[in-house]
Regions:
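Conserved strand-turn element in the central/C-terminal portion of the radical SAM core barrel
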Residues: 154, 158-165, 226-234, 260-270, ...
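Residues at or immediately flanking beta-strands
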Residues: 2, 71, 189, 225-227, ...
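Acidic, glycine-rich loop-and-beta core segments that form the ion-binding/anion-interacting portion
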Residues: 209-261, 272-279
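Proteins enriched for Cys/Gly/acidic motifs involved in redox and nucleic-acid/cofactor modification
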Residues: 1-200, 215, 239, 244, ...
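Short, solvent-exposed loop/turn segments at secondary-structure boundaries
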Residues: 52-54, 166-171, 201-207, 268-271, ...
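Terminal RNA-binding accessory module
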Residues: 340-429
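Conserved, mostly hydrophobic/aromatic
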Residues: 175, 192, 228, 256, ...
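Contiguous mid-protein beta-loop-alpha structural module that forms a pocket-lining wall or clamp
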Residues: 305, 321-322
């Protein structure tokens, strides 16, 4: 049978989609594109905000309307959090944010019998890391490797600890073996991902540090680039940077969670750092990885955020000089403390502050990309786009160049100009 996937949300979801693709492929099924006619469609959902939930529902409704006779299966954080919504949306197979093998089994059972299936667990009771096959479709150049799941930070705006459960870490030996398998299959880059990879190891014997895992993987696959998923400021220390700076195949791009550049807002968010500690992390990364790309997320118009607090955030992001940012207006999430906070801000304020923050972010992004002009970057090429081949440099800047079939090749490119959402250059002989 033929199936197609639609993935919303984080890189962990991308990994889990790749794992489910692999489970289907090993059983003799095929994985098609979303727009193709298939026997079943799997939607891997995100529930990080109420806006994400709205997008989930829109994708499910559109899929059901366009494919009235196909099996529609939904998994991920949205179905984990709101399983009661699935029946009204016409979903045939309902899974949560774990038990992917069982979910695939239910999908195949429904495809054969047309009997609806549902299986959910209590996320807060999870204690074991779910081992899944690493991989997916062979035409990809970059593979996700989940090394951790769960979160216990309980930030005031976030529901993910309730949908993903407590921290569970992949044993180091398992992660290394999966990384080797991905390298042997031809992937040129491996992204270490999880819900909060900074917590990797806290539940393992001896509580090993994340650096032990990253170092072991970098040594095991020297032919692959290794990229880190989102990090927390607390983990960026001098020892962390010194140890990882020794690996040439570690990509110098660090997504450092921020959310706000104002200490009083960070306190209301229940984040576990202040701007001084955050900037210390930025300075350490710049010191040990010269020219690295530091990227982040920012929530604007959090409940009670005053104009002065917002201006503090803008000044702070300018100080940090981020290479790229994701800007989100605060979205109320029922069931979280922030949803009950006073002084909820209106859409007009959210929109104006989003525009202001995006303008600063775009200015910084352009400055970072302009600084690359004249440099030579090792680019992993992925696909053709508008007459160019596009790929990513180690710092994750998108690079466009003209050339013949370059898929999954790493080539030296001299950067000549800023172009679209990245830079362009010429491939060196």
């Amino acid at each position: 049978m033929k199936f197609a996937f639609y993935t919303l949300g984080c890189k962990t979801n991308q990994y889990e989609t790749q794992a489910m693709e692999q489970l289907l492929l090993t059983q003799g099924h095929t994985v098609g594109r979303w727009e193709e006619a298939c026997d079943g469609y799997i939607i891997n959902t995100c529930s990080v905000t109420a806006v994400a939930d709205k997008k989930n529902r829109a994708v499910i409704r559109r899929c059901r309307k366009q494919n009235p006779d196909a099996v529609i299966a939904v998994c991920g954080c949205y179905s984990q959090h709101a399983p009661e919504a699935m029946d009204a949306l016409g979903v045939d197979v309902v899974g949560g944010s774990a038990q992917r093998q069982a979910f695939v089994d239910m999908l195949l059972e429904c495809a054969n019998t047309r009997q609806k299936q549902q299986q959910l667990d209590n996320a807060l009771r999870r204690r074991e890391f779910e081992v899944l096959p690493a991989g997916g479709l062979s035409e990809r150049t970059r593979a996700m490797l989940k090394v951790q799941d769960g979160c216990v930070n309980f930030c005031s705006y976030c529901i993910i600890p309730y949908t993903r459960g407590p921290v569970r870490s992949a044993p180091l030996e398992l992660a290394v073996e999966q990384a080797k398998a991905l390298a042997e299959r031809g992937y040129r880059e491996i992204v270490l991902t999880g819900i909060e990879i900074a917590s990797w190891g806290v539940d393992l014997p001896g509580k090993p540090a994340l650096t032990a895992l990253v170092s072991a993987i970098c040594r095991a696959v020297p032919q692959c680039r290794v990229r880190l998923g989102s990090l927390e400021p607390r983990i960026i220390t001098e020892d962390f940077c010194r140890e990882l700076a020794a690996f040439a195949n570690l990509c110098p791009q660090f997504h450092l969670s921020m959310q706000s550049g104002c200490d009083t807002v960070l306190a209301r968010m229940k984040r576990k750092y202040d701007t001084a500690r955050y900037y210390e992390s930025v300075a350490l990364l710049n010191r040990f990885f010269p020219g690295c790309a530091i990227t982040t997320d920012m929530i604007v118009a959090f409940p009670g955020e005053t104009p002065e607090e917002f201006q503090q955030s803008l000044a702070f992001i300018r100080k940090c000089g981020f290479a790229d940012m994701h800007i989100f207006p605060y979205s109320r999430r029922p069931g979280t403390p922030a949803d009950q906070m006073p002084n909820q801000l209106g859409n007009e304020v959210k929109e104006s502050r989003s525009r202001a923050a995006i303008a600063v972010a775009e200015e910084m992004s352009r400055a970072f990309r302009e600084a690359l002009v004249g440099t030579v970057q090792e680019v992993l090429f992925e696909e053709q786009e508008g007459g160019y081949f596009a790929g990513h440099a180690p710092n994750y800047v998108k690079v466009y160049a003209q050339g013949d079939e370059l898929h999954n090749q790493i080539r030296s490119v001299e950067i000549t100009s800023v172009h679209l959402d990245g830079v362009s250059g010429r491939i060196l002989p």
